[in-house]
Amino acid sequence: MENALVVADDLTGAMDTGQGFAARGRGVRVRLRGNAERPDPTATRDVLAVDTDSRDAAPAVAAEAVTRAVETYPAARVYKKVDSTLRGNVTSEVDAAVAAAGADLAVVAPAFPATGRTTEDGRHAVEGTPLAEAGYGVEESDLRAVLADSRYRVEHLPLATVADGAEAVRGALADLAGAADRPVLVACDATTDDHLRAIAEGAEALAGDPVSTGAEASGDSEILFVGSGGLARHVTVPGEPTPTTVQPASRPGTLAVVGSTNERTLVQLAAVSDELVVELDPAAAVRDPEETGRRGAVRLNRLLDRRDRAVVTAATDEGDIEAAEHVAAETGATAGERVGTALAAAAGGAIAGAQPGSLVLAGGAVARAVLTRLEAPELALTGRAIADGVPESVVASGPARGTRVVTKAGGFGTERTILNCLDAL
């Protein structure tokens, strides 16, 4: 049994949420093929984060993946990770987690103030811009509206209550839970880390857990925590910490694989010297990803031998993205999937050849593709991070065991984040 289970819809989300626990000394493993193996029911582990790879799945398929993960890995505390920009199957996955965990109440707080994500008056924003206008492909800014299709009742916890602290949150949550047939989803405002701390501690008090602020434990409600990497920093894990240590490899060399086409990632790529970047032809990557990746690996091996660091991507500007999508439309292929395969093939060839000791993986889909290519089903978080939302880990099993891995969601980081990752490793 796990002390805590994190269920995320993509790999970078599982990583940055798990980091919220690892940074406080908890032993955190992140599993890619989380639904494929049934664990030993007599063993007790600390924190397991499972990537269901369901962000782009049909809602029913995503819900089933979440249900299977929660049922496969029983845990004293369940944390349903959702994207901090509310992409993916948010409502269907939260509903599935509520049912599978047997929760009376779900505390939904996707804010991540350290990365510019905030919620006020129920409306979610990115660096002050309403979510629907922030360029993430999400049409709704109001968290309550996003959850409106839930099979459960949706309530709102306003900022004024949250700002009053954990005891006020506990009381408000108790009232909301008592005023409706359970379960109930509570959409929470938060604009600072202190607000997220109050939400976590108030909910834990309602669940009967002791909290450091002195909020009075008042019951035995089963609480499902729903949030991004922000709330995870403040949720308490039951049981004693059991740190998990995997010795990192001493091999030199760092390879960055950049699959995200988020505008912020493109800006970060522009800050890296052209001499370090191998760009795959995006149209060729869609037509023949394996061959394109093989050719890219040859160039990467030469560069790593000379410089000990390299970056591979298939998109440095909007023109590259359009080229890939044009060929995909002609051939009936899926551009993102084909390009991801090409990047993973290039990375796999470079790792087999130059054998860099460290990887930087930007974008959840390409991170999963690369690690799958390496037969690396599980990562151990070290508790260290290059920046907010950019955690460090080590491959915990498989042929690549010991390889250091840093992951970054496409929308996270500053202009120098990719460069800083290369420097840090």
Q: What is each of the regions a protein language model found here?
A:
Residues 34-37, 58-70:
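Glycine-rich, highly charged phosphate/nucleotide-binding loops
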Residues 2-6, 27-31, 61, 70-75, ...:
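Cap/lid and interdomain-hinge subdomains that line or gate substrate/regulatory clefts
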Residues 45-54, 296-298, 305-308, 393-425:
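A structural-propensity feature for long, helix-poor, extended segments
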Residues 67, 80-125, 140, 361-364, ...:
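Active-site histidine-anchored catalytic micro-motif
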Residues 334-365, 371:
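Extended C-terminal subregions enriched in glycine
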Residues 1-44:
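N-terminal basic/disordered segments at the start of proteins
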Residues 246-339:
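Redox- and metal-dependent alpha/beta enzyme cores, enriched for Fe-S-associated oxidoreductases
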Residues 18-19, 90-92, 117-124, 168, ...:
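Short acidic, glycine/serine/threonine-rich loops at helix termini
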